[in-house]
């Protein structure tokens, strides 16, 4: 039986943890890296490293096409996205699966339905579960957000809507 090959589509500590676990499972590990991470520890600990190019995350770790190409060119059997970057990107998961490579993570449909926090709250409510108190529609004005926060109780997590062209997501904890 040939050893399975896992491409880790992430960097740093996240990649190191995945590499350690993968080696415990006797998987051949493939790290990816950008210009900024050429000498990073995860590239040294992996069995193989694949150069993505670019120095910015948008040019490397957030570049779906480059990561799919890396998985193909390295003959990866599995792709682990880690977290952040493209881990919550349904299109990335779908592209990996379309190439016949196993995606380690939620199904693309699940990522899509859970990626929109308001839609995921509605879905959870629809199946009879009680979501954590929160909004069912986004606040357009600060006064709406303050009113809602006061009704839920502090602290609250204030989450910005993703900016579609960058896939950036951010949140802030508000204590009052």
Each model region followed by its residue ranges:
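Single conserved hydrophobic/aromatic residue that forms the stacking wall/gate
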Residues: 167-176
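ATP-grasp fold ATP-binding core
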Residues: 124, 148-168
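ATP-binding N-terminal substructure of ATP-dependent carboxylate-amine bond-forming enzymes
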Residues: 1-126, 139-147
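Acidic active-site catalytic centers that drive phospho-/nucleotidyl reactions
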Residues: 80, 84, 159, 172
């Amino acid at each position: 039986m040939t050893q399975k090959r896992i491409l880790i589509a992430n960097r740093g500590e996240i990649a190191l943890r995945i590499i350690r676990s993968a080696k415990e499972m006797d998987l051949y590990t493939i790290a990816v890296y950008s210009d900024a991470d050429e000498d990073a520890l995860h590239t040294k600990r992996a069995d193989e490293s694949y150069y993505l190019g670019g120095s910015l995350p948008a040019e490397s770790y957030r570049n779906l096409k480059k990561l799919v190409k890396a998985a193909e060119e390295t003959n990866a059997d599995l792709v682990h996205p880690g977290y952040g970057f493209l881990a919550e990107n349904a299109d990335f998961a779908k592209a990996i699966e379309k190439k016949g490579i196993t995606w380690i993570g939620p199904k693309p449909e699940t990522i899509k339905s859970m990626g929109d926090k308001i839609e995921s709250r509605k879905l959870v409510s629809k199946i009879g579960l009680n979501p954590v108190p929160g909004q069912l529609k986004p606040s357009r004005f600060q006064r709406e957000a303050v009113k809602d926060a006061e009704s839920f109780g502090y602290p609250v997590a204030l989450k910005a809507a993703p900016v579609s062209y960058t896939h950036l997501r951010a949140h802030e904890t508000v204590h009052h």
